[in-house]
Amino acid sequence: MANGKYAARKLKKDRQNHRWSDSKYARRARGLKEKTDALEGAPQGRGIVLEKVGIEAKQPNSAIRKCVRVQLIKNGQQVTAFCPGDGAISFIDEHDEVTIAGIGGAKGRAMGDLSAVNYKVEKVNGVSLIELVRGNAEKPVR
């Protein structure tokens, strides 16, 4: 490693080159999150519900997690989104407009015992799903 009086240029260049060994830096610099993410880097996205699906939880849990298949309005991609809350799936019908967000797993991926589900439903027809489940709001008729 250069450490002389006039070594600043080489030190800087070496640092720039070695940064690419850090996988987090390389992914960020190449913009891979925006390229692979269905929401294209946005915090939330709107979509139309195509169907309700039940997804089996991974071992050792035994449950059918209630999810929906959503087609995003911005790019037409289809994703699976989890419906959090007891009986939340009953407030969601096909062709409803839902707002989805990341489910909050590590590195922007799936969370808990739900494999391949990276998103959760936050709103149905503009009303918060949590409010609907609690009974604080009514679902508007579209």
From Swiss-Prot:
Organism listed in the record: Halococcus morrhuae (Micrococcus morrhuae)
Organism ancestry: Archaea, Methanobacteriati, Methanobacteriota, Stenosarchaea group, Halobacteria
Residue ranges, compositional bias (Basic residues): 7-16
GO BP field: translation
The name this protein goes by in its record: Small ribosomal subunit protein uS12
A molecular function (GO) term: structural constituent of ribosome
Keyword annotations from UniProtKB, A to Z: Ribonucleoprotein, Ribosomal protein, RNA-binding, rRNA-binding
PROSITE patterns registered for this protein in UniProt: RIBOSOMAL_S12 (PS00055)
Gene, per the UniProt record: rps12
Biased amino acid composition, Basic and acidic residues: 17-38
InterPro entries assigned to the protein according to its UniProt record, in alphabetical order: NA-bd_OB-fold, Ribosomal_uS12, Ribosomal_uS12_arc, Ribosomal_uS12_euk/arc
Keyword Ribosomal protein: yes
Pfam families with a match to the protein in the record: Ribosom_S12_S23
Subunit organization: Part of the 30S ribosomal subunit.
